Regions:
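A short, surface-exposed helix-loop junction/capping segment
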Residues: 23-32
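Nucleic-acid nuclease catalytic cores
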Residues: 88, 92-142
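A short acidic/basic microdomain associated with nuclease active sites
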Residues: 52-69
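Alpha-helical structural signal
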Residues: 20, 24, 102-105
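Nuclease catalytic cores
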Residues: 16-21, 36-40, 44, 48
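Short, low-complexity, charge-dense intrinsically disordered segments
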Residues: 1-14, 141-142
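Active-site beta-strand-loop-beta-strand hairpin of nuclease catalytic cores
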Residues: 72, 78-89
Length: 142
């Protein structure tokens, strides 16, 4: 019997997931220093400085291949960051997040073997973030 993927979201990180907690902490530091109002690329540039300071390994602008019947498609997604070699991190600078941005992260997770994703919005007075977990019933993590 095929397992149905479970999609769960959480607005808080805790000690059960120290990696996403560290990424959110770095994003909060960036937001504390820069505030809101900049373009997304400015926050990405700041993250390239902040992530190493927080001992967060990362790659920026990572191509995420998509396969169909084990054949690599010419179209691919591009994640803002992949941290700890397993967490997709997408930055936004929008007045408010919508289901479109959430779907973007979920599509990235679906196209890869990654099970965790973060959507972080810097354009509001308080930073906004949403954590996503993608996996089967036998592979849950919170």
């Amino acid at each position: 019997m095929t397992q149905i993927p479970q999609i769960r979201t959480s607005k808080s990180a805790d000690s059960r997931d120290p990696q996403t907690y560290a990424i959110i902490g770095a994003a909060m530091e960036i937001h504390r220093r820069l505030g809101c109002g900049f373009l997304e690329a400015v926050y990405q540039d700041a993250a390239e400085i902040e992530f190493p300071l927080q001992n967060i390994p990362f790659q920026r602008e990572v191509a995420l291949p998509i396969r169909y019947k084990d054949i690599l498609l010419p179209t691919h997604y591009r994640a803002d960051f992949v941290c700890f070699s397993e967490i997709i991190v997408e930055f936004k600078a929008l007045s408010q997040l919508t289901s479109i941005e959430e779907s973007q992260v979920l599509n990235y997770l679906k196209a890869t073997s990654f099970s965790r994703g973060l959507l972080i919005n810097f354009a509001t007075a308080s930073i906004q973030y949403k954590r996503f977990v993608w996996g089967s019933e036998t592979n849950k993590s919170v």
